[in-house]
Amino acid sequence: MPMVEFKHVEKYYGKFHALKNINLTFEKGEVVVVIGPSGSGKSTMLRCINGLEDITSGELLVNEKNLHSKEVKLKEIRKNIGMVFQHFNLYPNKTALENITLAPIKVLKQSSQEATKVAEKLLDRVDMLDKKDSYPSMLSGGQQQRIAIARGLAMNPDLLLFDEPTSALDPEMIGDVLNVMKKIARDGMSMIVVTHEMGFAKEVADRIIFMAEGEVLEDTRDVKGFFDKPQDERAQQFVSKVINH
């Protein structure tokens, strides 16, 4: 059973055609990396999966539930999908620990003690336990993003979405965040990652999706083959630019 299924999905912003006839399935346990030039619809597609954006037409199913059916409660769907944003989106007035425990306490009704225990384990997993009482303003961008990843894991999601998680970071911070993501992938987490980090894609992805101008132009599990010789001309241009940059 696919975790996520797009069937003939279209998305418009006014007259701008952001997603064009998207037909994709995402399976449990897969690490899928979505790449492509800016403005190709990658982040829009990701945001549709957890209901941050509405689709214009077609069907989008998450765990076989149609996201846009009136019977489906988005809150219930979102419980099972974690998301890590480009700009961290941490609460500035809460400590690292409080940022992680907030949703499990409010949404999953965990006790403060239980949520704290889980959060401390996750902080340890992302090498940030020593910063548990720090506020976001006291942390570097890379440290904030590792807290955001721990927060995404705290709900014990079936699927974790990453929307360009390193693009707002200073270059020296990127490696630490990618290492945490690699660790999570190796632990078997289902992940869909929008990124420009080609080294990460080569090393970790089970599958590559290449998008341009709102369309899926390549979708392959032959990751090495894709980077050696993409089939689509626009993918060839993109790969040669980013690899030789």
Regions found by a protein language model. Give the residues of each.
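ABC family nucleotide-binding domain
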Residues: P2-D219
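C-terminal boundary and immediately downstream tail of ABC-type ATPase nucleotide-binding domains
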Residues: D222-H245
